[in-house]
């Protein structure tokens, strides 16, 4: 189940995008996740690293192409992430993982335009809001889920 957390922090996908992710939206051979009908009904492509790819390959094994990867609706996914955080003693929400993704990328040297594109933001100003959070406390929170 925690593959969904890993996917969120490694892709910056929105809660609804994670919930609606189909097996056919993952291009394993190209190391890409295709977000279909994201916010504003826009599609985007997000690269994925080898670690996430291997976790998703394992999770998707035996599933049909039109099957959801995680099997949650958006609202229940948000509640599940909160529940996992509560279990670990960390107040966390699905959207916090998106903030973590953006902040972590910037701290590791990505430029703001790259982060904007990965998050699927139309406006650079929206991306700048995401970067106002400090990653340290979010990273500590994620480690508690390990």
Regions inferred by a protein language model and the residue ranges of each:
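Short, leucine-enriched amphipathic alpha-helices that occur as contiguous helical runs
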Residues: 1-2, 74, 78, 98-99
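Basic, Lys/Arg- and aromatic-enriched nucleic-acid-binding interface segment
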Residues: 1-15
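C-terminal catalytic core of tyrosine-transesterase DNA break-rejoin enzymes
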Residues: 6, 10, 83, 98-122, ...
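Conserved tyrosine-mediated DNA breakage-rejoining catalytic core shared by Y-recombinases
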Residues: 11, 20-55
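DNA/chromatin major-groove-contacting recognition/catalytic segments
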Residues: 47-50, 133-146
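Active-site/catalytic core of tyrosine-dependent DNA strand-transfer enzymes
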Residues: 49-91
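Catalytic tyrosine of NAD(P)H-dependent dehydrogenase/reductases that use a Tyr as the general acid/base
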Residues: 94-95
């Amino acid at each position: 189940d925690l593959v969904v957390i890993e996917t969120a922090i490694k892709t910056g996908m929105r809660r609804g995008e994670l919930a609606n992710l189909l097996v056919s939206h993952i291009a394993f051979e190209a190391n890409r996740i295709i977000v279909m009908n994201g916010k504003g009904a826009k599609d985007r492509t997000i690269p994925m690293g080898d670690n996430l790819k291997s976790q998703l390959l394992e999770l998707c094994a035996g599933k049909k192409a039109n099957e959801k990867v995680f099997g949650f609706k958006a609202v229940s996914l948000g509640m599940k992430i909160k529940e996992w955080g509560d279990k670990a003693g960390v107040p966390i929400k699905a959207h916090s993982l998106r903030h973590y993704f953006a902040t972590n990328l910037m701290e590791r040297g990505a430029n703001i335009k790259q982060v904007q594109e990965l998050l699927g933001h139309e406006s650079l100003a929206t991306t700048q809001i995401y970067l106002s959070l400090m990653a340290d406390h979010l990273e500590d929170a994620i480690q508690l889920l390990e």
